[in-house]
């Protein structure tokens, strides 16, 4: 699968003391570093995400960041030998939407220790629902 040059993400910015979320086009280079590139299928919306997007809680440690503290999807590329293209993975917390870009994007770049391989008998949707 080819990764497009630009894709959509829900990104949170801070300008002076004002937090401003926006749906915008970004590139893979805009994402935080990670060994695993994932085509995202599912994320969730929870209280912590709302705090991050509104600035009501001091969730994000740096700006801008893609929101979403969890994500499930399919590995596209990986330099980690334990995760191969086509593997289904889940990442929850692990600094997502705090110090690393989160799951509200068409693609994510995850650290290999954040990406958990989903067992074959569980769909990414079910894994996301369980967390």
Language-model features, listed with the residues they occupy:
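Short beta-strand or tight-loop elements
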Residues: 5, 22-24, 71
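Short gly/ser/thr-rich secondary-structure transition/capping motifs
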Residues: 17-23, 56-57
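Glycine-rich beta-strand-centered segment in the early N-terminal region that forms part
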Residues: 27-45, 56-96, 114, 119-122
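Cytochrome P450 core scaffold surrounding the K-helix E-X-X-R motif
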Residues: 48-54
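A structural motif shared across PLP-dependent enzymes of the aminotransferase-like
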Residues: 96-112
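A glycine-rich, Thr/Ser-enriched phosphate-binding loop motif common to dinucleotide/cofactor-binding enzymes
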Residues: 120-131
